[in-house]
Amino acid sequence: MHKLLKLLSITLIGLSVATGVQANVRAEMNQMKTVAATLTNAKDVAEFQESAKILREIAQQSSEKRPSSITNDADFKGYQEGMKEFITALDEADKLAQEGNLDAAKTAAKKLFDIRNVYHKKYK
């Protein structure tokens, strides 16, 4: 039951993003933080993959929006590169999950937090 509720909440977050709700970058980053945590706590491959799918959608949308803390094009390009790096790392973790290696996928997903920390120092 707990697993079902968790998946439903993740799905609702994803649907709100996918349906075009106009969220600012800060709200999207908070969503990313919540969903990223579900990756490292996933109980099975299906839960991991659902979270990865939603996180990828949020990250992709966020990469197209300029945060208010970024005031020039060069920094915005750097921010977008960081988001691209984040998405690439997410895809690598998801690939491990697709191969049935949940533990390796969860370990790889921890890299997302490192990437976040590096780019938050630069652009937050």
UniProtKB/Swiss-Prot annotation:
Keywords: Signal. It comes from the Bacteria. One of its GO terms (molecular function) is iron ion binding. GO terms for cellular component: periplasmic space. GO terms for biological process: electron transport chain. Residues 1-23 form the signal peptide. Pfam families: Cytochrom_B562. Belongs to the cytochrome b562 family. This is Uncharacterized protein PM0670. It comes from Pasteurella multocida (strain Pm70).
